[in-house]
A protein has these predicted regions:
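N-terminal lobe/hinge region of extracytoplasmic solute-binding protein
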Residues: 14-63, 93, 158
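Surface-exposed binding/hinge segments that line
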Residues: 60-62, 104-146, 167
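Ligand-site clamp/hinge motif
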Residues: 181-226
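Append "and occasionally in soluble cytosolic enzymes with long acidic Gly/Pro-rich linkers
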Residues: 256-321
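Gly/Pro-rich hinge or "lid" segments in bacterial periplasmic/extracellular proteins
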Residues: 28, 135-189, 193, 203, ...
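A bilobed periplasmic-binding-protein/Venus flytrap-type ligand-binding module shared by bacterial periplasmic
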Residues: 72, 176-182, 238-263, 267, ...
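Short, well-ordered beta-strand elements
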Residues: 7-17, 66-70, 88-91, 120-121, ...
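Aromatic- and charge-enriched surface segment that lines or borders ligand/interaction sites
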Residues: 57-99, 115, 121, 254
């Protein structure tokens, strides 16, 4: 006997403290995460933290301060118009105005030359190591905003991504699957529609979730159970990239010595800090990108808290205590 499997086609998502759905103007982390379904960058970063081409089909470093970017004009905006080089220039110009969280990405960009409809040359004021990683900001359409102020426009933003904005109505935003998405054959969504409900405060969102008005939300609240209880829902924990750390002034006579910094590292009980301060909701790390990263080498990781190792590290290098 075969059981019929019901495929969920719609999803209700909650977001609090909403500002704008425009990815270049929003400062809301949850909005920016959703925007990745709608808008796309020239380059993405994969699960191993390596760069992958997205809207760009080529990215070439032609000198220490210049890059040639080629795009695919077959990538289409929501209205069916093609992605063009002018869109890249337009987006970077908007970011240079300094009103976006992505503005830092183009801080060293001094100019964008349009070589043809599918090619731009990006010029930098100085060499930026791994500049390709800066090209992860969403691209916006130039022609769509002709004749108006991008920062105050009331138009519904459009992108080239997997989903498109169908409607914005008060405290509700509806996204629908982009059936003409350029990458649909490789990475299609099983969800057809996403209903986004907006809340002025996180407390309202929690209450709405408990009442069953939304299906999913994300939070960094480590005491979440105090607000929504412990039953009636499933929780998925996702490791983030934010971390607390101790920074050393390596120009100091003593701290400039590697053995001193290493000894201090051994002497700090990070596991106890996670337990007593963060209620075991965080994990210890020896490297800023210690998972899913091709640069991470487990062989170089310290053994963690070890007072005896801390002392022996100092003694082995001629220190007395």
């Amino acid at each position: 006997v075969e059981q019929e499997v019901t495929q969920i086609k719609d999803l209700r998502l909650g977001i609090s403290n909403f500002d704008t759905i425009n990815p270049l103007l929003s400062n809301n982390k949850e909005v920016l995460n959703i925007d990745k379904l709608i808008f796309e960058p020239l380059i993405t970063i994969d699960e191993n933290y390596k760069t992958q081409l997205c809207l760009a089909k080529e990215c070439s470093k032609t000198s220490n301060t210049s890059y040639i970017i080629k795009i695919d004009n077959n990538r289409k905006w929501k209205d069916g118009t093609p992605l063009i080089a002018k869109d890249i220039q337009f987006t970077i110009d908007r970011l240079k105005e300094g009103k976006s969280i992505y503005s830092y990405n183009v801080e060293k960009v001094i100019g964008v030359e349009i070589l043809d409809s599918s090619t731009v040359k990006i010029n930098l004021s100085e060499e930026v190591p791994f500049f390709e990683y800066n090209l992860t900001f969403p691209i916006m359409p130039n022609n769509y905003y002709l004749g108006e102020d991008f920062n105050t426009s009331t138009k519904i933003p459009m992108g080239t991504g997997m989903f498109k904005i169908k409607e914005i109505n008060g405290a509700n935003i509806t996204l629908e699957k982009n059936e003409k998405w350029w990458n649909k054959k490789e990475k299609d969504s099983k969800i057809d529609t996403i209903y986004i409900k907006l809340y002025s405060e996180i407390g309202e969102l929690y209450n709405s979730f408990k009442l069953g008005n939304i299906d999913i939300f994300t939070t960094e609240n480590t005491n979440l159970e105090q607000y929504i209880g412990t039953i009636g829902y499933s929780k998925i924990e996702i490791k983030g990239r934010q971390f607390d750390y101790l920074a050393f002034n390596c120009e100091d006579d003593i701290l400039s010595k590697k053995e001193i910094r290493k000894a201090i590292s051994y002497a700090i009980d990070k596991t106890n800090i996670v337990s007593s301060i963060y209620n075991n909701q965080y994990y210890t790390s020896d490297f800023p990108l210690d998972y899913g990263n091709y640069l991470y080498n487990k062989e170089n990781v310290s053994s963690g808290y070890n007072q005896e190792q801390s002392k022996s590290t100092l003694v082995a290098n001629g220190w007395e205590y």
